[in-house]
Design a protein with these regions (language model features):
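Sec-exported extracytoplasmic/periplasmic mature domains
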Residues: 10, 80, 84, 159-163
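Conserved polar/disulfide-associated segments of primarily extracytoplasmic proteins
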Residues: 4, 15-127, 168-191
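Surface-exposed amphipathic alpha-helical segments
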Residues: 13, 139-176
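Extracytoplasmic/secreted envelope proteins and their assembly/folding machinery
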Residues: 10, 72, 76-79, 151-155
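N-terminal leader-region detector that preferentially activates on the first domain or presequence
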Residues: 1, 52, 132, 142-143, ...
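A short, surface-exposed beta-strand/turn
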Residues: 128-139
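N-terminal mature-domain "stem" immediately C-terminal to a signal peptide or N-terminal signal-anchor/transmembrane
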Residues: 1-11
Length: 191
């Protein structure tokens, strides 16, 4: 999985080694298996981190505009399901606050950048996403922290393996995704 892409963080962040990554995943994320890389800020304790994940969803046509209202509705539905499955209610529930910023697709980089501000009980949380399309799915960079952590997607570079680049799509052999770009956005997890 690690050979799918390379994550280059901005100054002040460090990509964990393979063994450090596995330990971090086991301790903090519960053993998910689609993570390519984990990065921590210098001196970080794990409460603020970045992860690069791979979503092999098939080719997604990028000419469908992103409707933030539809994304917002889908996120709310996902949060309702998360709260129900986790038995969270009232003051302990995970709640939507706002986009921070709203989803925006850049056709030159083939990436969507956006942020979701949440409250988990009384605690604020922020997930920033940079989702870059591939010929067979997407790479998703997720920065996890709080609004006070000063997180930014600036300076992060995601370099996919050359043969996985979006423009390498072969309509004769590559599978197409069943959903749209919006569906792919809604597959992103909240951490």
């Amino acid at each position: 999985m690690n050979d799918i892409a390379t994550l280059t963080p901005p100054k002040g962040w460090k990509v964990l080694s393979e063994s450090e990554k596995q330990r971090f995943i086991n301790e903090h994320l519960g053993g998910v298996d689609d993570i390519i890389a984990i990065a921590l800020p210098d001196g970080g304790n794990g409460s603020v981190f970045a992860q690069l994940s791979y979503r092999p969803a098939g080719y997604v046509d990028d000419n469908i505009p992103i409707d933030p209202t539809r994304v917002r509705q889908g996120i709310s539905e996902d949060l309702d399901m998360l709260n129900q499955e986790s038995g969270l209610a009232g003051n302990e529930a995970v709640r939507w606050k706002s986009f921070a910023p709203a989803p925006k697709y850049d056709s030159a980089s083939r990436c969507v950048e956006y942020g979701v501000e949440l409250s988990i009980g009384q605690e604020p949380a922020l997930n920033l996403y940079k989702m870059c399309l591939l010929r067979n799915g997407a790479l998703v960079l997720t920065l996890v922290g709080t609004p006070a952590d000063g997180l930014s997607l600036q300076g992060w570079r995601i370099t996919p393996q050359d043969n996985l680049r979006y423009e390498r799509f072969d309509p004769h052999s590559d599978p197409r995704a069943e959903g749209t770009l919006i569906n792919l956005l809604l597959m992103n997890r909240f951490i």
